[in-house]
Amino acid sequence: MLETITSVNGVVNGIVWGPVGLALLFGTGFVMSVRTGFFQFGHFRYWLRNTIGAIFTDRDITAHTEKNDKAISQFQSLCTALAATIGTGNIVGVATAILSGGPGAIFWMWAMAILGMMTNYSENVLGIFYRRKNADGEWSGGAMYYLADGLGSKKGCKKLGRVLAVLFACFCVLASFGIGNMSQINSIAGNMNAAFQVPNLLTGILLAVLSALVILGGLKRVAAVTEKVVPLMALFYILGALTVVLTHVTAIPAAFAAIFKGAFAMQAAGGGVLGYGVSRAITWGFKRGAFSNEAGLGSSVMVHSSSNVKEPVQQGMWGIFEVFADTIVVCTLTALVILTSGFVDLNTGRMLTEVQGSALVGEAFSTVFGSFGPKFIAVSILLFAYSTVLGWSHYGTKAFEYLFGTKASMGYKVVFVAMVLVGATMKLDLAWDLSDTFNGLMMLPNLIGVLSLSGTVAAITRNYLDRKFHGKRVEPMWSAFAAYQKEEEAEEAPLDKAANE
């Protein structure tokens, strides 16, 4: 039975994460970049200033909502999305990309991220535009909703939209138990045992208790934790990585040269483990880039849709920054840590060690921090992976809610917490492979939705730019539903009146 599952999974995985799936992912990013006038470049300073640049100057970005308001702040939505996005892929995934695709894989990871910014932007724009309130008064949005209500509203596509929405939700629930839970917890337990000799069972019990305290409290409690944990864990890792890279500052030019050389030139087999050339660099760069920032999977839009923002484009800009922070900043630092620490021949791209995964990154950190290097990585993985569990708990909850209703979501949360203990104490090779596939299966219906609604994204973007840049007095495009549009306009009217007085 297990052999059959493994065999079928291998075939499906080869399709969704093979040339066809990766081309669809890259192509969607390119199409959305074109349709929005390459917004990520043309308005670089604007989106940077209105996201991370506004955290300390605009209270609306970070202000907590009222107790009876089920929405969360823009900053909380970003932190919860980054909590799920910045995970083991930023450490283990980058190491695997270099080992399997050579230094050139990092270039293609950047390429995927640059276009993925607009895929993530588009998901968030659609998420806000098609979101609706559930029975508890909480915003619910995501690929399920823009597939059912967006694609489904097109002529002859009603059934297709609904079927794809249900499939996406099913794949998301299954993926949440794998890549969003057990696989992450398994990484934590293994690294804590190797670095500090903490028994896996003890790690599982502690993490299950901590997860229950946060997850069972709902989105606002998850957001309250992630807005504190994510900035600290990111700062912790970035400072550590910068210390290593700057210690090896003389190797930085050669590291970048190896990245560009490997991206476009055939190189010899790496370390006797896996041969690679341009095609392998592209494949592994695209694949690990997608795993790292999740742009195209339709996952983080579920928490972005819970933001108290009115403008779809504003939340879309947070989606751009999310990919930028995850891949361009964190993954690049991990890559430079490995490439500047002497474990890769920068002239040929060959690996000079047989150490793999998180152990390779730990060894790279140990060139500066000594025996504390592996411990630093163990703590980083603990923070990254645990925060991923918190973020994915919300994704799975929203997908489960879409399938079975709001009242059923607590049952999902209880099972999700129980799986934390399972993840810490079991071997999960098949779980890793299956969750990898379910992630890819989430991607396919989501990208169909994004591409089919690319005109809507372009129209919303033009509407925003006309109002904000060109001074045109046009009706804002805030919601696809008249009732929510009027509700948002009613809330905005007193603010406009005060501004004009």
Located regions from the model:
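Helix-loop-helix module between adjacent transmembrane segments
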Residues: 32-33, 112-137, 148-186, 190-214, ...
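Membrane-interface loop-to-helix entry segments
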Residues: 24-48, 164, 168, 185-192, ...
